[in-house]
Regions:
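Non-catalytic extracellular/lumenal accessory regions of secreted precursors
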Residues: 53-135, 141-145, 168-169, 210-212
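C-terminal edge strands of extracellular/lumenal beta-sandwich accessory domains
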Residues: 124-127, 146, 153-163, 177-212
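Solvent-exposed serine/threonine-rich low-complexity stretches and specific carbohydrate-binding patches
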Residues: 163-171
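Intrinsically disordered, low-complexity coil segments
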Residues: 15, 144-147
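Active-site-proximal alpha-helical
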Residues: 1-56
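Short, surface-exposed coil-to-beta transition loops
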Residues: 149-151, 172-173
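Beta-sandwich interaction modules
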Residues: 170-178
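Extracellular attachment fibers and their assembly/anchoring modules
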Residues: 138-140, 151-153
Length: 212
């Protein structure tokens, strides 16, 4: 990520680097589209914005991204076109689409293969749109048995701001949130993967959202 940002900024022309936008376009994205994105901050939300605001540099920025094994062509803020799963089936999609119809999502798994806390796929992300002002129930249920026991925690975000979180101990997690219309991101992790240092633990669960 550091090299992509620097190569977008600098004047040097190197292998895979023909971009020289300077600081202003980067600053504009960081204080504008990136600051207000409904997605969580990532290379995808940043690159999608800087490409959109500097269309003449789109191809050259894609080349930079490709050199780092990131799919640039067609990129959106959610990384929907990404195909690099770092060799692990529990990485993609980065965001799973879900609707507030009470139907459980497909199974997703929180892993600590790449270490704990905020490392790759410790948190799994969902995105959904609230179409009306209402109370919504979020329910995460574990789908397997591991030691230590799976303990899903839920965080709800709007435009990068934490709206609410549910972190009681147990194999399932449920909470109600009053939401206004808009796009939301839900981050779910197995608590064991946030806090413990042993690798290769996996906690799998489904999520459902119900409008009350």
């Amino acid at each position: 990520i550091q090299s992509i940002l620097y190569d977008i900024y600098d004047d040097a022309t190197e292998t895979n680097d023909s971009v020289s936008l300077g600081l202003a376009p980067i600053y504009n994205v960081l204080t504008g589209a990136q600051k207000n994105t409904p997605a969580l901050t990532s290379i995808f939300s940043f690159a999608a914005a800087i490409k959109a605001e500097n269309p003449a540099a789109d191809t050259d920025i894609n080349t930079l991204l490709t050199a780092q094994s990131i799919v640039g062509s067609g990129m959106d803020i959610y990384g929907s076109t990404e195909t690099n799963n770092a060799g692990n089936a529990n990485v993609l999609p980065i965001y799973t689409d879900i609707t507030a119809n009470g139907i459980a999502s497909s199974e997703v798994c929180s892993i600590k293969t790449f270490s704990t806390k905020n490392k790759l796929s410790v948190y799994r992300f969902f995105k959904f749109t609230a179409n009306t002002t209402a109370t919504y129930t979020f329910s995460a249920s574990s789908t397997g048995t591991t030691s230590p026991a799976i303990d899903p925690d839920i965080k709800v975000f709007k435009d990068g701001v934490l709206v609410d979180k549910f972190e009681t101990t147990g194999p399932s997690q449920t909470g109600d949130v009053d939401l206004s219309p808009g796009d939301y991101v839900i981050a779910i992790a197995d608590f064991n993967n946030i806090t413990e240092e042993t690798n290769n633990e996996i906690g799998c669960f489904t999520l459902s959202i119900t409008q009350i």
